[in-house]
């Protein structure tokens, strides 16, 4: 109670939380409550409080009329097995293993991973590790063989981070300061090595039945 009163009375204050409160049973509620507290205490988007970032590009604050948002839809569908609600067109990764191992219509039988290791980074990791072994086919775009990619039928190596230019569109959405840094490649890339975008475009064409010789 004392902490709540001090927070409400403080001239400047901010409540902040990310992965620790978001990867639990009521993670969405926790994330919403954090922002609700900042709003109710008058600490939203003001100096000393919880401010909106305005990155150079890639976010809701970089386009459209300032101060107005259109919101987003959620709950338009549910996962097949445990009926977990959709949010922003995605389902919780906690449902992935059960969607692979549970027979029935629309059962997941194939998987593509890109530079990730969900066997270590997601809930029900042991169950997911076992489930990946049951897939009919799995492709990983990665430069490492790790706990996840070891299950892949094919590993397609993309250029390393030192061989690519870089502008961090995603993380600047959470930046403490509004910055824009662009990095040129450190190493010269082999021209015969396709970029991740080229690999994904080629795979998309193959998945659409255009064949392995399709031109992305």
Annotate each language-model stretch with its function.
Residues 51:
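Active-site-adjacent alpha/beta core region of enzyme catalytic domains
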Residues 1-36, 40-46, 54-216:
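Non-catalytic alpha/beta scaffold blocks inside enzyme catalytic domains
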